[in-house]
From Swiss-Prot:
Database matches in NCBIfam families: clpX, PRK05342.1
CDD domains, sorted: RecA-like_ClpX (cd19497)
Database matches in InterPro entries: AAA+_ATPase, ATP-dep_Clp_protease_ClpX, ATPase_AAA_core, Clp_ATPase_C, Clp_protease_ATP-bd_su_ClpX, ClpX_bact, P-loop_NTPase, Znf_CppX_C4
Residue ranges annotated for the ClpX-type ZB domain, each copy included: 1-51
HAMAP family on file: ClpX (MF_00175)
Function: ATP-dependent specificity component of the Clp protease. It directs the protease to specific substrates. Can perform chaperone functions in the absence of ClpP.
One Gene Ontology cellular component: HslUV protease complex
SMART domains, per the entry: AAA (SM00382), ClpB_D2-small (SM01086), zf-C4_ClpX (SM00994)
Binding site for ATP: P143, T144, G145, C146, G147, K148, T149, L150
Region Disordered, annotated ranges: 50-78
Official protein name in the record: ATP-dependent Clp protease ATP-binding subunit ClpX
GO term, biological process aspect, one: proteolysis involved in protein catabolic process
Length: 450
């Protein structure tokens, strides 16, 4: 269009000109580029006649998607399911700390896959006296970088099942701009190589679930398409339903072939930081938030101590507290198992650097060993890195960023210095680099004067 006018709107979706890339005018009507794309998708669907042959003039769809299929891989048996102690032992190899959360998840996951084995044996259907086993989804509550996603990912790795991660903040209610909840299932299906049976036994982790809380516990009189609306859309999926998943993603339309996935066997793990939830719990318990957990400047308590106290308060969490926070009762009822993860202190961060199977220190040692350099980290350097990560308040995620900063110049210079066979990162190097100074490199004048 020759002239921009914010008052002009698409006659089909109602978006104004400043919300779309292109708005095309017709005799008394307007259509935006997004609606044109949707029309093209509908028209591009392969049209067939009553005999199943392509209709004359019909063109195949532009996007070729792999066909969904069912595998011959047998369902898990009771004997093949690892016991809770075995599950926790495996988690200990990858995740440091969080013992209470590991125990909760080990039991919940064991019971979930026992339920699948029970159904696979047909006992739940043939025995009249058999008790119906309902699934128990899991809610993880903890600050950023404390290991929520890693716990879920490690479980899926141990059980050898497909695993998908979704961000709740991108989801919207059907009919609005954003992702439909069915797109979560598409990610899981893609992780399973379009194997429907495998996907139906997988694990889905929905992150940032606290961001879809409604603004108050009272039902909203206005449309909340990314909060309460998403919670409502997730209800059936969490409980168990046969969902129609568009194989190409995006919005569903009437002429699109969809893949049907039964979600009753999928384990959903929801996680979020739930900032401020401890205040809701304290209010219910009748404790003054300021007096019970004073700010750092009033009593000299550190922020770390406050975070630890918040985790201790959340041990008294009740479903009604989550309702007051903004989750609807129906949503909470479909996630009956909850676990509170504690914030990571400096000692735990030190352990994360060195102890897990894929610890960061081991990763960088392996990288430099390919250049015939034996890399070592002094104990006080490990402590300094953990202290800096703790100061940044982003949990274990800060560790990789700090080491990458420290090692950047080293990894740039060392491969070209064949005479250097070993190198030790010291505390002074960590402190100098995190303070903005250049890290001395081996064989340079800067190192000789240090």
């Amino acid at each position: 269009m020759a002239k921009f006018d914010a008052h002009l709107k698409c006659s089909f979706c109602g978006k104004s000109q400043d919300q779309v890339r292109k708005l095309i005018a017709g005799p008394g009507v307007y259509i935006c580029d997004e609606c044109i794309d949707l029309c093209n998708e509908i028209l591009d669907e392969e049209l067939v006649d009553s005999q199943g042959n392509p209709r004359a003039g019909a063109e195949p769809s532009r996007k070729a998607t792999p066909a969904a299929h069912k595998s011959n891989k047998p369902a898990p048996t009771l004997a093949s399911i690892p016991k809770p102690l075995e599950i926790k032992s495996f988690l200990d190899q990858q995740v440091v700390g969080q013992n209470a959360a590991k125990k909760v998840m080990s039991v919940a996951v064991y019971n979930h896959y026992k339920r699948l084995a029970w159904q696979g044996d047909g006992k739940g259907e043939t025995e009249e006296t058999a008790t119906r086993l309902h699934k128990s989804n899991i809610l993880l509550i903890g600050p950023t970088g404390c290991g929520k996603t890693l716990l879920a990912q490690t479980l899926a790795e141990m059980l050898d099942v497909p695993f998908a991660v979704a961000d709740a903040t991108t989801l919207t209610e059907a009919g609005y701009v954003g992702e439909d909840v069915e797109n979560i299932l598409l990610r899981l299906l893609q992780k399973a190589d379009m194997d429907v049976d495998q996907a139906q036994r997988g694990i889905i982790y929905i992150d940032e679930i606290d961001k879809i809380a409604r603004k108050s516990e009272n039902p909203s009189i206005t449309r909340d398409v990314s909060g309460e609306g998403v919670q409502q859309a997730l209800l059936k999926m969490l409980e168990g339903t046969v969902a129609n998943v568009p194989p190409q993603g995006g919005r569903k339309h009437p002429y699109q072939d969809c893949i049907q996935i039964d979600t009753s066997q999928i384990l959903f793990i929801c996680g979020g930081a739930f900032v401020g939830l401890e205040d809701v719990v304290q209010k219910r318990m009748g404790r003054n938030a300021i007096g019970f957990m004073p700010p750092a400047d009033s009593r000299g308590r550190s922020r770390a101590n406050r975070d630890l106290q918040a985790a201790q308060v959340l041990r008294n969490l009740e479903p009604d507290d989550l309702v007051k926070y903004g989750l609807i009762p129906e949503f909470i009822g479909r996630i009956p198992v909850s676990a509170v993860l504690e914030p990571l202190d400096e000692k735990t961060l030190e352990s994360i650097l060195t102890e897990p199977r894929d610890a960061l220190v081991k990763q960088f040692r392996t990288l430099l060993s390919m250049d015939n350099v034996q890399l070592q980290f002094a104990d006080d350097a490990i402590t300094a890195i953990a202290q800096e990560a703790h100061r940044r308040k982003t949990g274990a995620r800060a560790l990789r960023g700090i080491i990458e900063e420290i090692m950047l110049d080293l990894m740039y210079d060392l491969p070209s210095q064949s005479s250097v066979k070993d190198f030790t990162v010291t505390r002074s190097m960590v402190e100098e680099h995190t303070g903005g100074k250049v890290l001395p490199l081996p064989g340079t004048d800067q190192q000789k004067t240090a």
